C-alpha cells in the first residue's frame, strides 16, 4: 500500500498508510555559512596503488567545532564537531575532522564529492562549500562531471535511542536545482509493508519522523520537469538504515 504526497512550498508533509504516519519537515534555523569555503589543495598517491593523501583548506568554517543549535534541534550529532563529508561514487560518506587525511580508493574511476558539514551532519549548501573531482587510473574511465548529480548523504547507518525519533534527510545537488516547475526529488521510504513517497521541489534539509524501529529502505530519485528519471550517474540513490 502506498500514497504519494506532493511537497510544494509546504513546511510539514504527511504520508499516512494504515497505522503508520510518517512526516517530512523542512529543517529551519541552522547557521547558513554562506561565506564558508572548501578548497582542494592536492591529491597525492602513496606507495600503495590505491592509497591517496587528500589536502583541503577550509575558510570561514572551523572543523571540530560544535555547530550552534546542535543540541536543541534533536538530531543525531557528532561529538567531534563540524567536519568534511567525503563521498566516493555515491557510497556512504566518511567523516573527516582534519584538513589532511588519507583514503583507500578502488582500482577504478572514483568520483569524489566532498563538502562541509555541520556537526549534526547537515551539508553547507553554497557554490564554494564543495568540490567534485575524479581519480582514475585510466583517462578513458572518467565520466562527464557536467552532468546533473544527486548525491545521497543522510540518514545513514544505525540509530539508537532518542536518535531514532528525528532523522535528518540531506542530499547534495551538483549542476542542478529544484523548483515547482523544474526538477524535483522523489523520496520513497519503505518499512515492512508500508511505503511512503514524497516529492521535494526545493533543495533544503528535512527531517523524518514517525518511523518504527527496525530496518528502513530509502530511495532518492532526481526527476526532470516531466517526472522522468534523469539519466545520470548514481541516479537513483538507494540506502538501508536501522533504527534500534
Task: Name what the model sees in each region.
Residues 91-98, 195-202:
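Short beta-strand segments within Ig-like beta-sandwich modules, predominantly Fibronectin type-III
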Residues 12-15:
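C-terminal motif of bacterial Sec signal peptides marking the signal peptidase cleavage site
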Residues 61-83, 174-187:
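Solvent-exposed loop/turn segments flanking beta-strands in beta-repeat/beta-sandwich domains
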Residues 19-49, 135-161:
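Short, compositionally biased P/S/T/A/G/V-rich stretches that sit at domain boundaries
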Residues 103-109, 208-215:
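Surface-exposed, short loops/turns at beta-strand junctions within beta-sandwich domains
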Residues 53-59, 168-176:
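Short edge beta-strand/loop segments characteristic of extracellular beta-sandwich folds
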Residues 117-126, 194, 223-232:
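Short acidic/polar inter-strand loop motif in beta-rich domains
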Amino acid at each position: 500500500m502506498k500514497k504519494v504526497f506532493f511537497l510544494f512550498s509546504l513546511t510539514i508533509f504527511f504520508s499516512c498508510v494504515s497505522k503508520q504516519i510518517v512526516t517530512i519537515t523542512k529543517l529551519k534555523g541552522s547557521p547558513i555559512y554562506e561565506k564558508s569555503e572548501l578548497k582542494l589543495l592536492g591529491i597525492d598517491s602513496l606507495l600503495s596503488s590505491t592509497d591517496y593523501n587528500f589536502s583541503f583548506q577550509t575558510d570561514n568554517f572551523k572543523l571540530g567545532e560544535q555547530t550552534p543549535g546542535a543540541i536543541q534541534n534533536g538530531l543525531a550529532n557528532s561529538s567531534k564537531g563540524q567536519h568534511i563529508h567525503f563521498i566516493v561514487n555515491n557510497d556512504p560518506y566518511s567523516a573527516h575532522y582534519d584538513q589532511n587525511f588519507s583514503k583507500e580508493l578502488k582500482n577504478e574511476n572514483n568520483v569524489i564529492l566532498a563538502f562541509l558539514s555541520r556537526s549534526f551532519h547537515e551539508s553547507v549548501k553554497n557554490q564554494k562549500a564543495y568540490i567534485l573531482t575524479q581519480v582514475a587510473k585510466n583517462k578513458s574511465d572518467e565520466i562527464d562531471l557536467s552532468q546533473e548529480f544527486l548525491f545521497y548523504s543522510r540518514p545513514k547507518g544505525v540509530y539508537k535511542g532518542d536518535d531514532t525519533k528525528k532523522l535528518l534527510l540531506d542530499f547534495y545537488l551538483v549542476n542542478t536545482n529544484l523548483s515547482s516547475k523544474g526538477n524535483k526529488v522523489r523520496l520513497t521510504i519503505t518499512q515492512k509493508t508500508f511505503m511512503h513517497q514524497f516529492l521535494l521541489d526545493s533543495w533544503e534539509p528535512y527531517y523524518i519522523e514517525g518511523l518504527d524501529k527496525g530496518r528502513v529502505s530509502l530511495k532518492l530519485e532526481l526527476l526532470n520537469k516531466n517526472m522522468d528519471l534523469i539519466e545520470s550517474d548514481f541516479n537513483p540513490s538507494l540506502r538501508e538504515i536501522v533504527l534500534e
